[in-house]
Regions:
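Short capping/connector residues at structural and topological boundaries
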Residues: 118, 135, 202-203, 255
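Short, solvent-exposed turn/loop segments enriched in Gly/Ser/Thr/Pro and often Arg
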Residues: 81, 205, 257-260
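GST-like fold's C-terminal all-alpha helical module
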Residues: 2-3, 136, 143-248, 288-290
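Active-site-flanking alpha-helical
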Residues: 61, 124, 213-214, 254
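Long hydrophobic alpha-helical segments typical of transmembrane helices together
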Residues: 236-290
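GST-like domain detector, emphasizing the conserved glutathione-binding G-site
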Residues: 1-182, 279-290
Protein backbone atom coordinates (compact mmCIF):
# COMPACT_ATOMS: atom_id res chain seq x y z
CA UNK A 1 0.00 0.00 0.00
CA UNK A 2 1.01 3.65 -0.35
CA UNK A 3 3.15 5.10 2.41
CA UNK A 4 0.93 8.13 2.80
CA UNK A 5 -2.78 8.80 2.70
CA UNK A 6 -4.16 11.59 0.57
CA UNK A 7 -6.54 13.95 2.34
CA UNK A 8 -8.70 15.89 -0.15
CA UNK A 9 -8.79 19.66 0.41
CA UNK A 10 -12.10 21.39 1.02
CA UNK A 11 -11.94 22.86 -2.50
CA UNK A 12 -10.25 21.09 -5.40
CA UNK A 13 -7.84 23.11 -7.54
CA UNK A 14 -6.27 22.12 -10.84
CA UNK A 15 -2.58 21.22 -10.71
CA UNK A 16 -1.68 20.76 -14.35
CA UNK A 17 1.79 19.49 -13.49
CA UNK A 18 0.30 16.46 -11.74
CA UNK A 19 -1.19 15.09 -14.93
CA UNK A 20 1.82 13.07 -16.00
CA UNK A 21 2.10 12.26 -19.69
CA UNK A 22 -1.52 13.28 -20.24
CA UNK A 23 -1.24 16.75 -18.69
CA UNK A 24 -1.71 18.42 -22.07
CA UNK A 25 -4.91 16.63 -23.03
CA UNK A 26 -6.98 17.00 -19.86
CA UNK A 27 -8.37 20.14 -18.26
CA UNK A 28 -11.37 21.01 -16.08
CA UNK A 29 -13.06 23.34 -18.59
CA UNK A 30 -14.61 22.93 -22.03
CA UNK A 31 -14.44 25.09 -25.15
CA UNK A 32 -11.71 25.93 -27.67
CA UNK A 33 -8.25 27.15 -26.76
CA UNK A 34 -7.40 28.51 -30.20
CA UNK A 35 -8.88 29.25 -33.62
CA UNK A 36 -8.27 26.52 -36.17
CA UNK A 37 -10.56 25.36 -38.93
CA UNK A 38 -10.72 21.70 -39.84
CA UNK A 39 -9.62 20.48 -43.26
CA UNK A 40 -12.27 19.01 -45.56
CA UNK A 41 -11.53 16.40 -48.20
CA UNK A 42 -13.31 15.09 -51.28
CA UNK A 43 -15.32 12.23 -49.80
CA UNK A 44 -18.85 12.20 -48.34
CA UNK A 45 -17.64 11.39 -44.83
CA UNK A 46 -15.01 13.40 -42.99
CA UNK A 47 -13.45 11.69 -39.96
CA UNK A 48 -11.25 13.50 -37.47
CA UNK A 49 -9.60 10.97 -35.22
CA UNK A 50 -6.61 9.12 -33.80
CA UNK A 51 -5.79 5.41 -33.85
CA UNK A 52 -6.81 4.68 -30.26
CA UNK A 53 -9.42 1.99 -29.56
CA UNK A 54 -12.28 4.48 -29.86
CA UNK A 55 -10.93 5.74 -33.15
CA UNK A 56 -10.32 2.23 -34.47
CA UNK A 57 -13.98 1.31 -33.94
CA UNK A 58 -15.01 3.85 -36.56
CA UNK A 59 -12.31 3.18 -39.15
CA UNK A 60 -13.05 -0.54 -38.91
CA UNK A 61 -16.73 0.18 -39.55
CA UNK A 62 -15.93 2.40 -42.53
CA UNK A 63 -13.60 -0.20 -44.03
CA UNK A 64 -16.21 -2.92 -43.45
CA UNK A 65 -18.82 -0.82 -45.25
CA UNK A 66 -16.52 -0.22 -48.20
CA UNK A 67 -15.62 -3.92 -48.37
CA UNK A 68 -19.35 -4.71 -48.42
CA UNK A 69 -19.83 -2.46 -51.46
CA UNK A 70 -21.20 0.71 -49.85
CA UNK A 71 -19.39 3.31 -51.96
CA UNK A 72 -21.13 6.12 -50.10
CA UNK A 73 -18.98 5.25 -47.11
CA UNK A 74 -15.85 6.66 -48.76
CA UNK A 75 -14.10 8.83 -46.25
CA UNK A 76 -11.23 11.14 -45.49
CA UNK A 77 -9.55 10.39 -42.17
CA UNK A 78 -7.70 13.39 -40.74
CA UNK A 79 -5.22 12.94 -37.91
CA UNK A 80 -6.06 14.71 -34.67
CA UNK A 81 -2.94 14.97 -32.53
CA UNK A 82 -4.39 15.15 -29.05
CA UNK A 83 -0.95 15.62 -27.50
CA UNK A 84 -0.66 18.87 -29.45
CA UNK A 85 -4.16 20.00 -28.53
CA UNK A 86 -5.78 19.65 -31.97
CA UNK A 87 -9.03 18.62 -30.26
CA UNK A 88 -9.25 22.07 -28.65
CA UNK A 89 -9.23 23.96 -31.95
CA UNK A 90 -12.37 25.97 -32.70
CA UNK A 91 -13.31 23.90 -35.74
CA UNK A 92 -13.04 20.67 -33.81
CA UNK A 93 -15.03 21.96 -30.86
CA UNK A 94 -17.76 23.10 -33.27
CA UNK A 95 -18.19 19.45 -34.27
CA UNK A 96 -17.56 17.92 -30.86
CA UNK A 97 -18.10 20.16 -27.83
CA UNK A 98 -16.63 17.36 -25.70
CA UNK A 99 -13.22 17.70 -27.41
CA UNK A 100 -12.61 13.95 -27.62
CA UNK A 101 -11.89 11.74 -30.59
CA UNK A 102 -13.42 10.63 -32.85
CA UNK A 103 -15.85 12.97 -34.54
CA UNK A 104 -17.38 12.58 -38.00
CA UNK A 105 -19.09 15.02 -40.35
CA UNK A 106 -21.45 13.73 -43.03
CA UNK A 107 -21.18 16.27 -45.84
CA UNK A 108 -24.23 14.83 -47.63
CA UNK A 109 -26.58 15.67 -44.77
CA UNK A 110 -24.52 18.31 -42.90
CA UNK A 111 -24.66 16.10 -39.81
CA UNK A 112 -22.07 16.08 -37.05
CA UNK A 113 -21.70 12.84 -35.13
CA UNK A 114 -19.58 12.52 -32.01
CA UNK A 115 -19.03 9.65 -29.56
CA UNK A 116 -17.76 6.45 -31.19
CA UNK A 117 -20.87 4.43 -30.37
CA UNK A 118 -23.09 7.10 -31.88
CA UNK A 119 -20.98 7.09 -35.05
CA UNK A 120 -21.26 3.30 -35.36
CA UNK A 121 -25.03 3.47 -34.94
CA UNK A 122 -25.34 6.37 -37.38
CA UNK A 123 -23.39 4.54 -40.07
CA UNK A 124 -25.23 1.26 -39.49
CA UNK A 125 -28.58 3.00 -39.92
CA UNK A 126 -27.44 5.14 -42.84
CA UNK A 127 -26.23 2.16 -44.86
CA UNK A 128 -28.49 -0.56 -43.46
CA UNK A 129 -25.53 -2.73 -42.52
CA UNK A 130 -24.08 -4.55 -39.50
CA UNK A 131 -27.21 -3.92 -37.43
CA UNK A 132 -30.00 -6.54 -37.64
CA UNK A 133 -33.46 -5.41 -38.69
CA UNK A 134 -35.17 -8.01 -36.52
CA UNK A 135 -36.24 -6.17 -33.37
CA UNK A 136 -34.90 -8.72 -30.89
CA UNK A 137 -31.57 -9.12 -32.69
CA UNK A 138 -31.22 -5.36 -33.05
CA UNK A 139 -31.86 -4.92 -29.34
CA UNK A 140 -29.28 -7.58 -28.46
CA UNK A 141 -26.73 -5.80 -30.66
CA UNK A 142 -27.44 -2.50 -28.94
CA UNK A 143 -27.22 -4.22 -25.55
CA UNK A 144 -23.61 -5.08 -26.25
CA UNK A 145 -22.81 -1.78 -27.95
CA UNK A 146 -23.96 0.12 -24.88
CA UNK A 147 -22.24 -2.41 -22.63
CA UNK A 148 -18.97 -1.51 -24.28
CA UNK A 149 -19.57 2.22 -24.04
CA UNK A 150 -20.24 1.90 -20.33
CA UNK A 151 -17.57 -0.68 -19.52
CA UNK A 152 -14.50 0.40 -21.47
CA UNK A 153 -13.79 3.47 -19.31
CA UNK A 154 -12.98 1.06 -16.48
CA UNK A 155 -10.49 -0.65 -18.78
CA UNK A 156 -8.94 2.44 -20.36
CA UNK A 157 -9.36 5.36 -17.98
CA UNK A 158 -9.22 3.08 -14.96
CA UNK A 159 -6.99 0.03 -15.33
CA UNK A 160 -4.94 1.21 -18.31
CA UNK A 161 -4.22 4.57 -16.79
CA UNK A 162 -3.13 3.38 -13.36
CA UNK A 163 -1.34 0.23 -14.56
CA UNK A 164 0.48 1.64 -17.59
CA UNK A 165 0.45 5.43 -17.68
CA UNK A 166 0.12 7.05 -14.24
CA UNK A 167 3.27 8.85 -13.05
CA UNK A 168 3.21 6.72 -9.88
CA UNK A 169 2.02 3.16 -9.18
CA UNK A 170 -0.62 2.72 -6.49
CA UNK A 171 -1.84 -0.66 -5.32
CA UNK A 172 -5.46 0.19 -4.56
CA UNK A 173 -6.59 1.59 -7.95
CA UNK A 174 -4.64 -1.06 -9.89
CA UNK A 175 -6.22 -3.86 -7.85
CA UNK A 176 -9.66 -2.28 -8.02
CA UNK A 177 -9.66 -1.87 -11.78
CA UNK A 178 -7.87 -5.18 -12.46
CA UNK A 179 -10.70 -6.93 -10.62
CA UNK A 180 -13.28 -5.12 -12.72
CA UNK A 181 -11.50 -5.79 -16.02
CA UNK A 182 -11.25 -9.50 -15.22
CA UNK A 183 -14.95 -9.52 -14.40
CA UNK A 184 -15.66 -7.88 -17.76
CA UNK A 185 -13.50 -10.42 -19.58
CA UNK A 186 -15.46 -13.18 -17.86
CA UNK A 187 -18.73 -11.58 -18.97
CA UNK A 188 -17.46 -11.62 -22.56
CA UNK A 189 -16.05 -15.12 -22.29
CA UNK A 190 -19.32 -16.58 -21.00
CA UNK A 191 -21.28 -14.82 -23.72
CA UNK A 192 -18.95 -16.02 -26.47
CA UNK A 193 -19.11 -19.59 -25.18
CA UNK A 194 -22.65 -19.73 -26.53
CA UNK A 195 -22.42 -17.75 -29.76
CA UNK A 196 -20.02 -16.94 -32.57
CA UNK A 197 -20.26 -13.17 -32.30
CA UNK A 198 -21.21 -10.80 -29.53
CA UNK A 199 -24.89 -10.53 -30.42
CA UNK A 200 -25.42 -13.98 -31.93
CA UNK A 201 -24.60 -15.51 -35.29
CA UNK A 202 -24.18 -12.17 -37.09
CA UNK A 203 -21.13 -9.92 -37.13
CA UNK A 204 -22.34 -6.48 -36.02
CA UNK A 205 -21.33 -3.08 -34.75
CA UNK A 206 -21.21 -4.64 -31.28
CA UNK A 207 -18.18 -6.68 -32.34
CA UNK A 208 -16.59 -3.62 -33.93
CA UNK A 209 -17.04 -1.66 -30.72
CA UNK A 210 -15.70 -4.31 -28.36
CA UNK A 211 -12.81 -5.74 -30.37
CA UNK A 212 -10.51 -2.66 -30.38
CA UNK A 213 -10.60 -2.62 -26.58
CA UNK A 214 -10.90 -6.19 -25.34
CA UNK A 215 -9.53 -7.97 -28.38
CA UNK A 216 -6.50 -5.70 -28.27
CA UNK A 217 -6.12 -6.39 -24.55
CA UNK A 218 -5.97 -10.18 -24.90
CA UNK A 219 -3.66 -9.90 -27.93
CA UNK A 220 -1.21 -7.77 -25.97
CA UNK A 221 -1.74 -4.71 -28.14
CA UNK A 222 -2.55 -2.39 -25.23
CA UNK A 223 -1.09 -1.96 -21.73
CA UNK A 224 1.18 -5.07 -21.88
CA UNK A 225 -0.91 -6.61 -19.13
CA UNK A 226 -1.59 -10.07 -20.53
CA UNK A 227 0.36 -11.99 -17.90
CA UNK A 228 -0.82 -9.74 -15.08
CA UNK A 229 -4.46 -10.34 -16.01
CA UNK A 230 -3.92 -13.97 -17.11
CA UNK A 231 -5.81 -13.31 -20.33
CA UNK A 232 -5.07 -16.82 -21.62
CA UNK A 233 -7.85 -18.04 -19.33
CA UNK A 234 -10.50 -16.41 -21.54
CA UNK A 235 -10.38 -18.90 -24.38
CA UNK A 236 -13.65 -17.87 -25.99
CA UNK A 237 -12.58 -14.23 -26.11
CA UNK A 238 -9.29 -15.30 -27.69
CA UNK A 239 -11.12 -17.41 -30.31
CA UNK A 240 -13.37 -14.47 -31.20
CA UNK A 241 -10.45 -12.04 -31.18
CA UNK A 242 -8.42 -14.14 -33.59
CA UNK A 243 -11.42 -14.67 -35.86
CA UNK A 244 -12.00 -10.94 -36.18
CA UNK A 245 -8.31 -10.12 -36.48
CA UNK A 246 -8.22 -12.14 -39.71
CA UNK A 247 -10.72 -9.79 -41.37
CA UNK A 248 -9.04 -7.44 -43.87
CA UNK A 249 -11.24 -4.43 -42.93
CA UNK A 250 -10.17 -4.78 -39.32
CA UNK A 251 -6.53 -4.97 -40.33
CA UNK A 252 -6.95 -1.84 -42.45
CA UNK A 253 -9.03 -0.03 -39.87
CA UNK A 254 -6.32 -0.50 -37.25
CA UNK A 255 -3.82 1.26 -39.51
CA UNK A 256 -5.76 4.48 -40.04
CA UNK A 257 -4.69 7.51 -37.97
CA UNK A 258 -2.12 5.30 -36.22
CA UNK A 259 0.99 7.14 -35.02
CA UNK A 260 2.87 4.41 -33.15
CA UNK A 261 4.23 0.91 -33.66
CA UNK A 262 5.62 -0.58 -36.86
CA UNK A 263 5.86 2.18 -39.50
CA UNK A 264 4.32 -0.24 -42.02
CA UNK A 265 1.19 -0.32 -39.83
CA UNK A 266 0.83 3.46 -39.68
CA UNK A 267 -1.43 5.22 -42.17
CA UNK A 268 -1.60 8.55 -40.43
CA UNK A 269 -4.19 9.97 -42.80
CA UNK A 270 -6.42 8.13 -45.24
CA UNK A 271 -7.87 9.87 -48.28
CA UNK A 272 -7.98 7.05 -50.81
CA UNK A 273 -8.01 3.26 -50.75
CA UNK A 274 -4.61 3.24 -52.44
CA UNK A 275 -3.10 5.01 -49.44
CA UNK A 276 -2.79 1.64 -47.68
CA UNK A 277 -0.27 0.64 -50.33
CA UNK A 278 1.63 3.87 -50.91
CA UNK A 279 1.29 6.19 -47.90
CA UNK A 280 2.18 4.16 -44.81
CA UNK A 281 5.03 5.61 -42.77
CA UNK A 282 7.57 3.07 -43.99
CA UNK A 283 6.93 4.37 -47.52
CA UNK A 284 6.94 8.04 -46.56
CA UNK A 285 9.93 7.83 -44.20
CA UNK A 286 12.07 4.86 -45.29
CA UNK A 287 14.52 3.57 -42.67
CA UNK A 288 17.81 5.42 -42.90
CA UNK A 289 16.40 8.40 -44.80
CA UNK A 290 17.28 11.85 -43.53
Amino acid sequence: MADKTYTPPKVWTWDKASGGRFANINRPIAGPTHDKELPVGKHPLQLYSLGTPNGVKVTVMLEELLAAGHSGAEYDAWLINIGEGDQFGSGYVDLNPNSKIPVMFDTTTKTRVFESGSILLYLAEKFGAFLPTDHNKRTETLNWLFWQMGSAPYLGGGFGHFYAYAPEKFEYPINRFAMEVKRQLDVLDRNLAEREFMAGDEYTIADMAIWPWYGALVKGLVYEAGEFLQVHEYTNVIRWTDQLAARTPIQRGRMVNRTFGDPASQLRERHDASDFEIRTQDKLEPEGSS
